[in-house]
A protein has these predicted regions:
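Re-entrant/interfacial helical elements at transmembrane boundaries that shape
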Residues: 39-48, 62, 77-97, 128, ...
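A structural-propensity feature for long, helix-poor, extended segments
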Residues: 66-77, 84, 294-319, 323, ...
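Short helix-coil transition sites and intra-membrane helix breaks within transmembrane domains
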Residues: 31-40, 78-88, 121-125, 261-271, ...
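Helix-loop-helix hairpins and the membrane-proximal interhelical loops
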Residues: 1-58, 138, 189-294, 379, ...
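Transmembrane alpha-helix interface/packing and boundary motifs in multi-pass membrane proteins
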Residues: 25-39, 68-81, 156-161, 255-265, ...
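Membrane-embedded alpha-helical modules
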Residues: 109-226, 336-489
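Membrane-embedded alpha-helical segments of transport systems
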Residues: 67-72, 113-125, 133, 177, ...
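Membrane-interface alpha-helices at helix entry/exit sites of multi-pass transporters
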Residues: 56-60, 97-114, 285-297, 326-328, ...
Length: 496
């Protein structure tokens, strides 16, 4: 293996490789930062360009776009509470709070640092333990997917702020919204009201933009917050070594969580981000800071979602199974280049594969370098008065929502959920649990029903499979431990 890695490293050392990594990363960051323009869109749009390229150059450019877009979503999530991608929704919780406090520069730097750490750890795991992780990933069936989704849903209690009941209500509403469209098992229309646009369900991007961006803009207009002071001025302070050190363990843990989840086909960066965020809050010594401007919260979210980038290649390269939409496109790109993903790929195209895997480490290094430079430009956004920014943000939101399906209906969905988000926020109901339930709802429902069909209606199937049982135990602990911790704190406060 070591000789293959060294050969891949030598093969990577080409000006052409680095130029296209640089260009791909720049394009990816721009796509990620613009609401509605996802990594999938970037990779799909530029894939035809790579057909005439050297396989290493073409695939590395597409991977650069993937990593860049995953990181880029955090920029607008932090600066204007408009996650560029669903994977950055958890980042907006603490990132925007820090921006309002005047620490947006620190938030952006933490997001960049955590994204780089997550991406590099994921790339290293791809390089060294891909076959082992692929074996674990293929053992996931419907019961395991249900248990994983259930574990993800328990995070609702962590992201509900001070009122868990309101968070659970929003989670229930999100689950209901996720049921709109054709039944995933029987194909029967549900909650469509005979409207043809609802048959396919609601797209995540318009819902995300509405709940976060539009609702926030309505709030600003209502309060007439049009001054620069509405988004507090960035202080010139930088992220300190002690702050990086304090969040480094969180980054490592979240990167591993993201890598494990990313290796499981059909999951994705959004799920990894929320699970990493919930776990970081659960073990934190200061959980009360989460939601009001915690650097640990940003570190967990960004390390988690970027930990997915390399991990999704594990089932793709070793088994020929794409982990998400981006790797499904990469599957086509590899096949057009004459490489058929699967167990024999390492024997037939070992040199090319190891060059790509080593190159993924350099992709993340380029992300850090380019991100460092771009942060200086992005912070200037907060200097622009909000009465100029609001029309620009609305235009970007409309463009992003429309771009999903080239349908005006998605723009209407965005506006509707903007109003929903504003009304619920007005009465103290957090919208993040609703978004999490919309993301995880389809996986939870479909996998649960498939499991019950397999077991002829017996719930024993969830308790007789080791991985499934482990996630169920984690779900119970995720709910029970915070309650026990709160009770202990209450008893201590009473004795004091």
């Amino acid at each position: 293996m070591f000789s293959n890695i060294m050969a891949g490293f030598v093969n990577l050392l080409s000006i052409q490789n680095f130029v296209f990594i640089f260009l791909g990363m720049m394009i990816g960051i721009i796509f990620g930062a613009l609401p509605g323009l996802t990594a999938t869109m970037a990779v799909a749009l530029f894939t035809p360009i790579t057909f005439g390229m050297n396989p290493v150059v073409g695939i590395l450019m597409l991977l650069s776009m993937y990593c860049g877009a995953t990181y880029g979503g955090s920029i607008t999530a932090i600066l204007i509470k408009t996650p560029g991608t669903p994977a950055s929704a958890a980042t907006a919780i603490d990132g925007y709070a820090l921006t309002q406090q005047g620490h947006g520069g620190k938030a952006l730097e933490m997001a960049l640092f955590a994204s780089t750490v997550g991406g590099i750890i994921s790339a290293l795991m791809l390089l060294f333990i891909a076959p082992v992780m692929a074996k674990v990933a293929t053992s996931f069936g419907p019961p395991e997917f249900f248990a994983l989704a259930l574990f993800g849903l328990t995070i609702i209690s962590s992201i509900s702020g001070n009122n868990i009941i309101k968070g659970l209500i929003m989670g229930a509403i999100g689950m209901l919204v996720s049921c709109i469209g054709l039944d995933r098992i029987t194909g029967v229309p549900r909650l469509t009201f005979n409207h043809r646009y609802l048959v396919g369900g609601l797209q995540l991007i318009p819902v995300l933009i509405g709940l976060f961006a539009i609702s926030e803009l309505v709030r600003k207009v209502e309060k007439k917050d049009f001054n620069v002071s509405d988004v507090a001025e960035f202080s010139k302070e930088k992220l300190t070594g002690s702050e990086i050190k304090g969040s480094f363990l969180t980054m490592i843990k979240s990167s591993i969580i993201g890598t494990v989840i990313g290796a499981i086909p059909g999951t994705g960066a959004a799920i990894a981000s929320f699970i990493s965020y919930g776990e970081a809050k659960r073990v934190s010594k200061t959980p009360e800071k989460f939601g009001s401007g915690s650097l640990d919260g940003i570190a967990a979210s960004e390390a988690g979602n970027n930990g997915v980038t390399g991990a999704t290649l594990i089932p793709l390269l070793t088994l020929g199974i794409p982990g998400d939409a981006v790797t499904a496109i990469l599957l086509g790109s590899l096949m057009i280049q004459g490489m058929i993903p699967g167990p024999s790929l390492f024997q037939t195209h070992g040199k090319v594969l190891y060059t790509i895997m080593v190159g993924l480490i350099f992709v993340n290094i380029f992300m850090f370098i380019e991100g460092k430079f771009l942060i200086k430009l992005f912070v200037k956004i907060t200097k622009v008065p909000m009465n100029f920014m609001i029309p620009v943000i609305i235009l970007l939101c409309i463009t992003g929502a429309y771009a999903v399906n080239n349908a005006y209906f998605d723009v209407l969905v965005m506006l509707a959920f903007g109003l929903v988000g504003y009304v619920f926020s007005r009465f103290g109901f957090p919208v993040t649990p609703m978004l999490l339930a919309i993301i995880l709802g389809p996986t939870a429902e479909e996998s649960m029903r498939q499991s019950l069909i397999i077991s002829n209606g017996s719930i024993k199937i969830f308790f007789t499979r080791p991985i499934c049982l482990a996630f169920i135990i984690l779900s119970v602990l995720s709910i029970a431990l915070p309650i026990i911790k709160n009770n202990k704190n209450l008893k201590r406060s009473k004795t004091v």
